[in-house]
């Protein structure tokens, strides 16, 4: 079956640093708890992973923000912990405490028992969702697939859930670096296969979320996080539907490492609000596109203040292509959807002036 032609390719064009008429925008966690319609579907599903595993419902929540807002991309509704879950670690969610694993891995013996999951068997529900979303989108906007980075997945797998001080994962990293590298290798192979399976199923762009890379020292970041993302980028399918499949790397609090990240082979880097976009562009704008970078907490402000922040970020990046507007991290559940609408409308209103010479 031939895929329908893409009606809006603004997002893919910006990632390729090709001319655009306005700055494309999507929001991390755009399908989520801030939307009343999401809460309704989430209630039907029962629990979060049941929602991820239900093709029809995962497709529905992916589409919800696109019906409400004029966005330039859809992102697969899923979770970064699907891979460790498929490895049999017993993922569960505890109210108010986030994800937890019944069987964390903290020794070489436990790590050696891990296998790369079968992408069309244990993770087939993700690929089914990608295919369903592509059908539903019908060429309206591109679909982004994603995964957590090996380091970020490892933090959850070793800690057994969320953590504030990363003591267990850092203990493994320093006390038994060989075990840590063994774990990161199996995760890098898993993520490569996982993203390639998403691309084969129809994802037109992919993103690697390195949520916890920013807790490492520069030396450890390069050895335990970036090296494995580079490995993934090198192993990805880079063309589908007759066009390039761009890859974006995002390390939260990773602004100091943009040069090293830009040398990874990625097409774009996500930037959070702790880095100035003009600074990021001066440093790596010649090599990669940039995505970001409004603090999601600005969405608590009145629409006039949101509009002011959007203008400030557009001015910071400056004129020309190569910028995808986004938040610097996921949208907060308490945000008023009308404030998200004001954010998107402000980008539509003010960004064309920055592209008059594209």
UniProtKB/Swiss-Prot annotation:
Keyword field: Cytoplasm, Decarboxylase, Lyase, Porphyrin biosynthesis
Q: What class of enzyme is it?
A: lyase
Q: What CDD domains has UniProt attached to this entry? A: URO-D
Q: Does the keyword NADP apply?
A: no
The listed locations are: Cytoplasm
**Entry's InterPro entries?**
UROD/MetE-like_sf, Uroporphyrinogen_deCO2ase_HemE, Uroporphyrinogen_deCOase
One GO cellular component, as annotated: cytosol
Residues annotated as binding substrate: 29-33, 79, 156, 211, 329
**Which E.C. number(s) belong to this protein?**
4.1.1.37
What pathway does this protein act in?
Answer: Porphyrin-containing compound metabolism; protoporphyrin-IX biosynthesis; coproporphyrinogen-III from 5-aminolevulinate: step 4/4
- UniProt GO MF annotations: uroporphyrinogen decarboxylase activity
Its Gene Ontology biological processes?
Answer: protoporphyrinogen IX biosynthetic process from glutamate
**What are the coiled-coil residue ranges?**
none
Record-annotated disulphide pairs = none
Assembly information from the UniProt record: Homodimer.
Report the protein's function: Catalyzes the decarboxylation of four acetate groups of uroporphyrinogen-III to yield coproporphyrinogen-III.
Hey, which family's this protein in?
Belongs to the uroporphyrinogen decarboxylase family.
**What PANTHER family does the record point to?**
METHYLTETRAHYDROFOLATE:HOMOCYSTEINE METHYLTRANSFERASE RELATED, UROPORPHYRINOGEN DECARBOXYLASE
The protein's name is Uroporphyrinogen decarboxylase
Q: Which organism is it from?
A: Idiomarina loihiensis (strain ATCC BAA-735 / DSM 15497 / L2-TR)
């Amino acid at each position: 079956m031939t895929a329908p032609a893409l009606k809006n390719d603004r997002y893919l064009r910006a990632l390729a640093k090709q001319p655009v008429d306005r700055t494309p925008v999507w929001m991390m966690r755009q399908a989520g708890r801030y939307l009343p319609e999401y809460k309704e579907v989430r209630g039907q599903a029962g629990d979060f992973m049941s929602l991820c595993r239900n093709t029809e419902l995962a497709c529905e929540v992916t589409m919800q923000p696109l019906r409400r807002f004029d966005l330039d991309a859809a992102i697969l509704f899923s979770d970064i912990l699907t891979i460790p879950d498929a490895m049999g670690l017993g993922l569960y969610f505890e109210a108010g405490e986030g994800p937890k694993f019944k069987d964390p891995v903290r020794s070489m013996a436990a790590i050696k028992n891990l296998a790369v999951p079968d992408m069309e068997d244990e993770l087939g529900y993700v690929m089914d969702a990608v295919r369903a979303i592509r059908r539903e989108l019908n060429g309206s906007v591109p679909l982004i697939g994603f995964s957590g980075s090996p380091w970020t997945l490892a933090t959850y797998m070793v800690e057994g859930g969320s953590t504030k001080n990363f003591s267990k994962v850092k203990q493994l990293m320093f006390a038994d670096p060989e075990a840590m590298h063994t774990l990161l290798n199996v995760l890098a192979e898993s993520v490569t296969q996982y993203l390639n399976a998403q691309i084969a199923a129809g994802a037109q762009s992919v993103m690697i979320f390195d949520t916890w890379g920013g807790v490492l020292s520069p030396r450890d970041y390069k050895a335990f996080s970036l090296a494995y993302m580079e490995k993934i980028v090198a192993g990805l399918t880079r063309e589908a539907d007759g066009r390039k499949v761009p890859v974006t790397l995002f390390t939260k609090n990773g602004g100091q490492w943009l040069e090293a990240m830009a040398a990874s082979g990625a097409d774009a880097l996500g930037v959070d609000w702790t880095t100035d976009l003009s600074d990021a562009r001066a440093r790596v704008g010649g090599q990669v596109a940039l995505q970001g970078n409004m603090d999601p907490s600005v969405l608590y402000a009145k629409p006039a203040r949101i509009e002011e922040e959007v203008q400030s970020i557009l001015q910071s990046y400056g004129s020309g292509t190569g910028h995808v507007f986004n938040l610097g991290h996921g949208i907060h559940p308490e945000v008023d959807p009308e404030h998200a609408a004001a954010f998107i409308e402000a980008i539509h209103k003010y960004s064309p002036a920055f592209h008059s010479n594209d």
